[in-house]
């Protein structure tokens, strides 16, 4: 990670604001006023604790664009649509060869139903499984039934043991 803790995944060159840097910057300004700093550490503490696993439904090429349409949608992880947040996307089957500039999008007919735009990714195909990383903070609580879509299952992994903590909604 660039400028942050070694475990926090960010796009190359992006510096994150750590609690330490935040405090070093604000304490000198706020202390003379008798004010305290409070922060809500959700994303910082749990962001990398989750991944959204999705399957490639099909590939669509139009002109210079390569669309990777997946079965997850903006209702499963809204942060890219709301905040243009970066989530590393990793094929769960090792891929070789040149990277392809790809837009990873969901099946909901909305302009905001995307997970990545113009992202260099290994060439993937129908049926491949992808993991969208850093989805632990707010991924679940911001999920919705938008467009009559069901909420996905949630799996807790501890060591080599996996447990269903929320069944897929039907």
Roles of regions detected by a PLM:
Residues 1-38:
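Acidic, glycine-rich loop-and-beta core segments that form the ion-binding/anion-interacting portion
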Residues 25, 33-170:
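Charged (often Lys/Glu-rich) extended helix/loop segments that serve as interaction or gating elements
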